Design a protein with these regions (language model features):
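N-terminal targeting/tethering segments
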Residues: 1-77
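Residue-level recognition of oxygen-bearing side chains
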Residues: 36, 127, 140
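PPIase-associated folding chaperone regions across multiple families
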Residues: 71-133, 146, 162-240
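Short, well-ordered alpha-helical segments enriched in acidic and aromatic residues
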Residues: 141-150
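Short helix-loop boundary/capping segments
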Residues: 156-157
Length: 240
């Protein structure tokens, strides 16, 4: 954080919480989750393969050897401790994969589709009707959109679930190059033009992200009660 935001980052606020406390809470939650996942893995007999163990050892060596002597002293850490930490994370990942391997995470290409649109937005029906008339008379979408949106066209990349439903339905029903009729959504009026009805590489990336979300939602649904049943005590002297 300091490398990106500077040393003053810890006095800033995140979601109404001091940054230092926010980061500690996030790390604490992550550590508790990993420890509980390792306990569950032990109960279920989940272990690392030889290949995984070798990869963990190699990664720990690489990480430790990249630390300066000053960093090693400041962290007060040994290579064995790094390898133990990496091993726990690898076991947690293995448990996660095992638990989520049997669920259906299929996402259709249409549900994952990412499109690019331009739109004209107006606060009144009369204004958007005026814009529609100009388009119907052959004026370019760019020219009309510029008058309603400032110096540049209003252009955006869209995924399902990000917009008002009426806007989304109209936008995703368009083919490349098509323009919608007047759409009312969220108390405003729009005319939408589709510049790409499928950004294929971004659609594939979004499909992967949606599948990962499904896995995480499922894992949380089955693991949170287990985690809540465990008593975890932090070493306050070390933690603070």
């Amino acid at each position: 954080y300091e490398n990106v935001f500077g040393s003053g980052v810890w006095s800033q606020s995140m979601e109404g919480v001091n940054m230092d406390d926010y980061v500690k809470d996030q790390v604490r939650s992550k550590l508790i989750r990993v420890k509980c996942m390792n306990l569950s893995a032990k109960e279920k007999g989940v272990v690392l393969s030889r290949t995984q163990k070798d990869a963990v050892s190699s990664a720990a060596d690489t990480f430790f050897n990249a630390l300066t002597q000053e960093q090693v002293s400041a962290l007060n850490v040994t290579k064995d401790q790094i390898e133990k930490m990496f091993t726990e994370f690898a076991i947690a990942d293995t448990l996660y994969d095992d638990v989520t391997s049997q669920i259906n995470t299929e996402v259709s290409s249409d549900d994952a589709r990412v499109i690019t649109i331009q739109y004209i937005c107006a606060g009144s029906k009369s204004d958007i009707s005026s814009a529609k008339e100009r388009l119907d008379n052959g004026e370019s979408f760019y020219s009309v959109a510029k008058d309603f949106g400032g110096e540049e066209e209003s252009e955006t990349e869209c995924k399902r679930g990000e917009m008002e439903q009426a806007f989304e339905t109209a936008a995703f029903n368009l083919k490349t190059g098509e323009t919608s009729s007047i759409v009312e959504a969220g108390g405003k009026y729009y005319i939408i033009r589709c510049t790409s009805d499928n950004e294929k590489s971004k659609t594939e990336a979004n499909k992967t992200a949606l599948m990962d979300e499904k896995k995480l939602e499922y894992f949380n649904s089955v693991f949170e009660s287990y985690e809540a049943s465990k008593y975890v005590e932090m070493n306050k002297k070390v933690w603070n």
